[in-house]
Amino acid sequence: FHLSLQSGCDATLKRMNRKYTTKEYERGCELLRKYFVHPAITTDVIVGFPGETQEEFEETLSLLEEVRFDSLFTFIFSPRVGTPAAKMDDPVPMEEKKKWFQRLLDTQNRISVEKHKEYIGRILPVLVEEENPADAVNNLNCRTDGWRLVHVPGDVSLLGQRKKVKI
């Protein structure tokens, strides 16, 4: 499930003209986890939106820790001509935005590794997608229902098939 977050701070969300709060967002994630078995939840975050402060950025990091996304798509804010955000004052220096961006990536990478480790030993259905020529042993790339990449040994005749594999 991909639920667009944009920011983990209500003040930033308001400046973005988003019509939801972080509490409403968290509730949506809770409902997914209540009604689906091990749902993969992904999101996107914009770093350095005009007016974002260090404290607001820290709120986004805190929300990442709280929700524990499976993966994250993140971008440094860049103005688009014709949008309201392009006309906003943007006091955040690019160097600061880059630091925030890296902290966000580092935090999510750690969370993703922790979440991946939870799957070790489990048997999951996968779709065998393509050959993996870079690995002579685990020569097939597969995807779980939660879009996790899994490398397994096998014959190319398995391409396009669904199989169960032990992680």
Model-found features: residue ranges?
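Terminal RNA-binding accessory module
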Residues: K87-I167
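Conserved non-cysteine loop/helix-boundary elements of the Radical SAM core domain that shape
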Residues: F1-S71, F77-E96
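Short C-terminal domain-edge/linker segments immediately following a structured domain
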Residues: E30-F36, S71-F75, R103-D106, V156-R162
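OB-fold and OB-like beta-barrel modules that bind single-stranded nucleic acids
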Residues: F1-L3, L72, V128, K166-I167
